[in-house]
Each structure stands twice: as C-alpha cells, then as structure tokens.
Amino acid sequence: MFTKKLILAASLSVILASQAANAVIGPIKISLNNEYRTSTPVIGAIATSIKLDKSDIKKTGATTFVNLLEKIPSISFEGGPGNLAAVRIRGSESKHTLLLIDGQKVTITGGQPNFKMIPLNQISRIEILKGPFSSLYGPGAIGGVINVFTDKDTNSITSSSIDSSYGSNGTKQSSFNTYYKNDASYLDFTFTDFITDGIDATHKTTGGDDDLDPSDRQTFGLNMGGDIGENTSVSLNMIDSRANIMYDNPDPAGKYENDLRQIGLGVTQKFSDRFETRVDINDQNILRHGSKYELNTISIVNELGFDSSKLSVGLMNSADKDVGNNREIKHTDVFTQWQGLIIDNEVSIGARIIDYDKFSTHTTYNFNWARDLSSTLRVNGSYGTASHLPNHYEQNLNIVADQTTLKPEKSTNLEIGLSGDYDWGNTEFKIYKSKLKDAFKYFSASPAYYKNDGIVNIRGAELSIGTDFLGWDIDTSIDYNKAIAASTGLQKGRRPNRSISLNLSKTSGKWKRNINWIAKSRSWDQDSNTNGWGQTAAELGGYGLLNLSTRYDFTEDLSIYLNRNNALDKNYEMATGYKTPGKTTTLGLTYNF
C-alpha cells in the first residue's frame, strides 16, 4: 500500500512537471514560518517559542530525540530507554502536545505521541511553540506544538556527510546524508542506523524482569522538490523508520515493533503577487506493538496578501484509522487567520471550525498582539481557546463500554510578556494562565471508560536571559508552573513546578565547548498524591543534571566530538519504579565531503 501511494505521488509530480516543461525554472524550496503557517509573514514573532537548528542540537550532546527533549527546561519530561516518553508543555497533559513531522501531525498511540519514532540525526531543525495553537494546527495543540523538520534550510549548499559514534550502554550510531541542489531542484537523502543495549528500565518489584531493554532503529528520509513552472512548485517528503524497542512486559507479549512511514506531497501555485494556494496530501502509517494505525490528511490553504496584512483561509480533512479495530477518528476543519499592522500594532486573529463525526461542531479561536515600545523593548499578549479530541485508546474503551457522549476537552488561555534586545544581550519574561474544562477522567468500571469530569487550572511564568561574557555565550531560563486540579486543589502528578537551565558555549580556534546544567524541583508521582489504595503516593525528588560536550575540528570537513551526559552520575527518577541512565559517554566522528 505504501509503495503504491509513493508511485502515485511520484507520478503526480511527473505529470505536473511535464505540463510545465517549457516554463522558466526559478528559485526553489520555501520553509514555512511555524507560528503563522506561511512562508512570508508580515509581522514579527508573538508566540513563545524555542528554535534549535542542527548546530544547536549538536551542542546539547543529546544522542536521541527524547534525550534532547529532557534538556529543555520548560518541558516536563518523563521516560527513557525501555519505557514510553511523555512530554508536557507548561503543565499540560502529554496528549496535549501536538507532534508534527515536516508540518504533518503524528497520530497518537498509547495515549500520547510516540517521540521515540524520530531519529535525532534525521532532524534538521526543531521549533517548539508554547501555548494553544488549535486554531492553526487543529485539535490537540492545547499545551503546545513540537514541529520537527527533516529537510534542509534554504541556505544549505550541495554536500555530503558521514557521522559515526560509539558510547555507553553499547550505543552505536551511524548516519549518511547527501544534499544536492541547483537552480531548478533539490534532493536531500539521509540514512541512520542506531542500536543500543539500553538499561534495565524498571525495577523487578514494579513489573521489571531484571534484564536490559535494548532497541535498534534503521531510518531513511528523502526530501525532494523544485519549481516546475514560473509560478508552480512541488515537494515530496518521505521518512521510513523501523525499530524494535524492548519494553518490559509489552502488550501483547513479544511485540516490540515501533515503525513509522510517512509520505507527503505538496503543491504551491502562485496566481499573482498577492494570491497563492498550497495543497498538502499526507499519508502516515504506524506499527506499534502489533497494532496498526493510518493517518490520512489533505489540506488546502489560500493566502491573500495586502500592503500591510495577509489573510489565510484553509480547509483540512483528517481520517485517523485504528486498522486492527476497524475504527477511525474523522474531522473536517475550516480555518482562517489574518495578520497585519494596525497603527504600529502587530496583530493576528485566527479561528477554526472543527466538525468531528462523533459529536457536534465546535470552534477554537486566537487573538495575538504585539507592539514595539522602543527600539529595544517589545510587549505582547495573546488570548485564545484550544481543544483536544479523544484518541484511539480513549475512544475504543468508550465504544466497548457503550459510552459515546465524550465531549472534546477545551481550554481557555491568556498570556502577556515583555522582551528586550540590548547591546549586552536579550531577555524575555512571560506570564500565562490556562483553564482546561471537560478533562477526560478514567473510570475503572467493568468495562472501564472515560468521561468528562474535572477542571485543571494552570498558571506560570518564564524568564530567559542571554548574554556573552569573556567569549562565552550564556543562556539561562527560569520557569515556574502550577497545574492544579480543581477537584482536589493539588498539583498534577509528575509536573515539577520549578525548573532552571544554564547553558554556556564557547568557540576557541578549532575547539567548541558546551556546558549545560538543568535542574527540576520535586513532584508527586500521582495526580491525587495517593497511589490508588489510599496510601500516600511516592514523592519524586528534585534533581540537577550536568551535561558536557566538546568538539575539535581537525579541518573544515573533519571533526571529532565527545559528549558526557549526566556527568555527575546523578541518581534520579521521573516516574516511580522507572530507572534513568546514569553517567554516559559518547565519542563520535563527522566527515563532510
């Protein structure tokens, strides 16, 4: 099936190319702005975001995507080798984080996005948007959006590279990348092989089996495209990732598959200097522990530009299928966003109407505003709503229990902030609050099911400062967050309410050094601060991790690097009964040609 769809997509590209074979070939490759979902925004950034390019990712010393996420201070992270990874942005649930690959949603399995499907070496850049973005990206984006890009940026030059490394716990990684472009087209191909012996992730007293939990993954990615006419461009993005991840006691037994295959075709047609249309068709297949899922989406976005504003109007259809159970989650959305300048005020307004096949239509919206108070100081604010639909796990339980009245979770969000850019560096301060209504709650009846029951109030503040001192680039951030369940008045489980990060980097001749320290406060393991039997739940202690990395460039094309994660060998837990890696070392070599 996947091969047939690939042939169809390639055939469509050929047909479009043949229709414009005599046209003038122009510039190619457009990268979308993540916040406004357009390649040509007319206003500056308003949303709180974290952006990491390839060099930033290398500086962290991370060996896997989940290892990278663990180093980001404003994210509550749990998981590691041998167990599922959960990512919470600003105190929200893990299922409220929308994961995108090249702009396309990754379907939720096991109650949350599967971050282990994405190999780190395939990633060109990452953009993390904090806050509600359902109006722009659809249901699920309550806490934020993590957009992973596998394609090169527009400034890349024709080149090839090989990267190979070996590290603790028998971890071996090799990757090959080649990128070619000319005035008419581009092609980017990457292959990665990753294998590790892992660690014994769970204690025997909590269901573990006293053995290592190894994993292996082979991935290839292909990005190609170009202008096939003066006003028409096409792109084809593919990623095929196949893995076995040896979780303790998988269900069903002996099923360790963790595969992702995604293909996306995009066509952009420019009708005039002010009006263009983009069509994206995406097919995604996931195999996880013997269960098969398929996500098909098609979106059409029309952009109409004016002198100081832009209007986007789009339509999206999504069919998320649980193949084994012959069930699907379908919704059709109409969305719009206007952005522009109003008397020195930068404003964006958006809305999305979501028609979900299991219940009535609902609407989400957003209003964002910013203004430059001076040449160095900027103020911004936003207000909006977001929603989350039941995922396959929740929906299947309710169908079996004949409970079909589950409504979407909805949140209302407010944020205000100041940012400054000075000769000595930059700073940003944000405060925010969010109210989640109709939260899904699990009821252990026979059969079990979910119902709408509860409100969660979230409040927080974030401060970041960047400067340089004695040749060191210094970035620090402090985050405070409280996610309180209204029914209990208690902090939600596994959500440290304080975190701090300090990052120092320096280049001296051929040497590049990076020091990262991140600390998180204590938290409870359970939402109710009890373990379900009326006993006090385990308290997860606070911890601090020191991560070191250094790189030496023998030539412009040959480099060697050494990473030391958790250099002080800190013993800590992110979830009761689950172990985390101790001190690890990775030695690697990169060659460009």
Which sequence ranges carry the predicted segments?
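Non-catalytic regulatory/gating segments with a bias toward low-complexity or hydrophobic composition
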Residues: L69, I126-I128, I146-V148
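Short, acidic, small-residue-rich periplasmic hinge/interaction motif at the N-terminus
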Residues: A21-K58
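Extracytoplasmic beta-strand/coil segments of soluble accessory domains associated
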Residues: V66-Q104
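Periplasmic-side early beta-strands and strand-to-turn transitions of outer-membrane beta-barrels
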Residues: N147, T154-I157, D163-S165, N177-N258
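Face-selective signature of the C-terminal outer-membrane beta-barrel domain
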Residues: G225-A243, E257-L373, R378, G420, ...
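Short acidic/polar hinge/loop motifs at secondary-structure boundaries
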Residues: Q104-P132
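Outer-membrane beta-barrel signature, preferentially recognizing the C-terminal barrel domain
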Residues: T97, P252-I263, V267-K270, K292-E294, ...
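Gram-negative outer-membrane beta-barrel transporters
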Residues: S308, L341-E346, Y432-K435, N452-S528, ...
